[in-house]
Amino acid sequence: MLEQGCKGFFIMAEGSQIDWEGHDNDFYGQYDEIEEFENAIESALAFAKNRQDTLVLVTADHETGGLLIEKDTLRYKETNQMKVSWNTAIGKGDHTGAMVPIFAYGPGSANFTGILDNTDIFFAMQEAIGINDLPDGTCY
C-alpha cells in the first residue's frame, strides 16, 4: 500500500511509552517498551535492506528519568556473545538535558554522524531526499 505513491512516503513511529515509563521511574516498564520499539526498528530495517531508496532514522526528542547503564556493566568483549549485567540507576522522572543518540541506515545516512543539534536533523533529512530551499508555504 505505501509503495503506490509516486513521490514515496514518510512514516514516523514514536515509542512514547518509553518516556511515560521514565516519568514513572519504572525500569522494567522502560525495558519492555524499548523491546517493542526495537521490533518496529527491525521491521523498518528489513524493509530498507531490500531497497536503495529508503532511509531509516532512529532518535529521541529527549531523555527521561536519567536511566544509566553504569560503568563496567559489560562483562564480555566478544560482541557476538555479549552478556550484559543491568546495573542501572534511575533519576527523578523528569526530562533531562542528556544527549540522545541518532542512528541512520540507508542513502544519506552519512549526514547523521557525530554530535548534531536536534534542529539540524530536519536539514539533514532535506538533503538526504534532495529537497533544498523550499519556498515558504511549499508542501512536498
Question: Model features per residue range: what roles?
Answer:
Residues 1-140:
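A post-motif C-terminal structural segment
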